[in-house]
Amino acid sequence: MAARLVVDAKCSYPAACNAVETLLWDPEATAALDSCVSALSAQGVELRGCKETRKRHPQMNAATGADWDTEYGALILSIRQVAGLDQALAHIARHGSRHTDVIVTQDPVAATRFLAEVDSACVFHNASNRFSDGYRFGLGAEVGISTDKLHARGPVGVEGLLTYRWVLYGHGQVTTDYGPGGRHYIHKDLPVDG
């Protein structure tokens, strides 16, 4: 599942603001890393790895400190090994854009913690970050994005004080499955407890 998600997240539209820029991996997930590297390489993605990642995949370029903070807008992806969820959360808190972050795991406890603790506008479990899109959320045409928590200026009414955080639980969905000849988005109001 990880390889399919990361290929969609990087290759379906690499210049998009919701394209993945950094892949973090746990040392217990070497098989998933290997399949991601293979799939991304087959798509022509330039991979830049940390020292630990390059020990496993010496063919990739060395990542620099700047890579962890770069929005490439191209077929380039940085890859970093992290020692567990705590280190992943710390990396995201320091280097993340606060736009969209994804965890790919079968561990529901880790997923729940990730979704609760990552301070991004959109946090997803087992789904491509390319789903982070106004149209896909049923908001109509997207006129802009914000990673700030309060974005209103000038006179502010109640609507101007509201912000949204999107949480998506998935089962391996990718955006390339949707569109002409494929699956369709369904936009409908859902009951909200509150």
Question: Which functions belong to the PLM regions below?
Answer:
Residues 1-74, 125:
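ALDH superfamily catalytic-core signature
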Residues 5, 64-194:
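Conserved C-terminal structural/oligomerization subdomain of aldehyde/semialdehyde dehydrogenase
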